[in-house]
Amino acid sequence: MKILVPIDGSSYSDNSLEFVASRATLLGKNPEIELLVVLAPLPTRAARLVSKDSLMRYYEDEAEKIFKPARKFLKTKGVEVTEAFIVGDPAEKIAEEATKLPADLIIMGSRGRTALAGLFLGSVTD
């Protein structure tokens, strides 16, 4: 079974990690679990001010800030995962990655923003 777990460092994605960790053995024998971080692209004007290498390092550093605590938590639970990060629209990129894997299951939080921002901006899961 291939499971995609999009995370963003929010308490909602922490809940999805706890769900995966507590039920990993119920999700099939040796499930393949991929953690996915989707980062919003920097505005074009800002991105033009730095080199492509610097921009890629920035995205890698931002993704690592999200992966590191997730990786540490899942390791303590004995859950092995692969990791991927993509830059773009979260809903679009999650759907693309789910198709590419192909994922049998997507486990993700219902919100990733603060409640107030979610009220005005919506959510990827909406």
Residue ranges and their predicted role:
Residues 21, 64, 68-75:
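Class I S-adenosyl-L-methionine
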